[in-house]
Each structure stands twice: as C-alpha cells, then as structure tokens.
Amino acid sequence: MSRGRLLSVLGAVAVVAVVVIGLSQTKSDNSAPKPDTFDLAAAKRSLAGAPAPLAALHDRSNTLIPADKQVYAGEIKGLAGHPIVVNKWASWCGPCRGEFPVLQSTSVKYGKRVAFVGLDASDSDSDASKFLGHFPVTYPSLVDRNSHIAQSLGIGRSFPTTMYYDARGKVQYIHQGPYTSDAKFAADIERYALGRPS
C-alpha cells in the first residue's frame, strides 16, 4: 500500500473514531437524571406505623447528613434489632443513576421491616442534592465526602455497592454493582438482611 493511500485510510479511521466518540458522549449526556414519577409523600404515608428506629429514618428521608466513621457506627448501632441495607452511591455514577428507581420502590416495600441507609461517597453536596431531587428516597444518606467510611468498610472502590446487615448488626453480604430489577434486590434483602433462605 502506498504512503498516500495509507494516510487516506488512517484519516478516514480518525474521522469515524471522532464521530463514534461524539455520538457516545451525546448518548451519555442524554442519560442524565430525569425527573422521576416517584411520589415521596405517598411513599412516606405508606410507611406509617413502622417501628420507631425505622420511622426515624423515614422522618429524615431524602436528606444528606454529614458523617464520619463515628457517625456511621452510631447510625448502625441505633438500628440494633433491625436488618439494615446500606447503599453506597454518588451522583456522577451512571450505574447508581440506573439503580435508584429499584431502590425507591423496594425500600418502600420493605421499609417497615428493614432499615435503609444511603452512603453518598466521593461526591459534592450540590450534585448529590440535585441527584436526590430527581431520585428521592424514603431514607437519609450519610455523606462520606472523602470515602473514609467506605474505605473503612472495605467498599471504597466500587460504585454502587450494597451492604446487608442482619438484625444483630453483622455484615452478611456485600453486593458490588447495580441492581437492575426489583426482584433481584428483593431476593437479596430476603436472603441476607432478613435471613430467609432462597
């Protein structure tokens, strides 16, 4: 192949690469959070009558709470006697964005029996607040700005990550990656948080 022809082929490949990259970036821009149809007020009403520690979480629904390792430990200790699901997320995490509708619906389904706590890691307050404006949840999120809590739990690198504590406060399972169906999330809650064999 002549040098001129080779340069022409390489130029064509470069143009195709630029077009593909441009289209993929446009697609990712379209995946930004969109207003959700989840009705937080109705969800909270459906959780009325939950045990006091769980009701206290619902009272702080959709809030960001500054935290450190001691605050996290206190939150878990205060939920003693109840199974706990902790979901680590960030506003910039595409898989987290895809998972939140599953978290919304399933946390309402189990919210009278299981404590749900968010862990917003490596994020900014303003971006996290905007994210929760699009994807409100019936539980608070502890803010782990520098991922110190996540690192101490051994879940510092993967987003999203979901931890399951049994009612004694013992970690039973850590799921890395997003839940894409209510059924899979519910099955893991039943098995690892509630201790019911599948």
Language-model regions, residue ranges each:
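A short beta-strand-turn-helix
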Residues: 59-84
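Hydrophobic beta-strand anchors of alpha/beta hydrolase catalytic cores
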Residues: 85-86, 116, 162
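Second-shell loop/turn segments in exported
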Residues: 58-63, 92, 117-118, 176
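Extracytoplasmic/secreted envelope proteins and their assembly/folding machinery
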Residues: 69-76, 100-107, 125-132, 150, ...
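Thiol/disulfide oxidoreductase modules built on the thioredoxin-like
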Residues: 130-138, 145-197
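Conserved redox-active cysteine motifs that mediate thiol-disulfide chemistry
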Residues: 88-105
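Conserved segment of the thioredoxin-like fold in thiol-based oxidoreductases
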Residues: 58-59, 98, 108-109, 114-146
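N-terminal targeting signals for export/organelle localization
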Residues: 1-66, 198
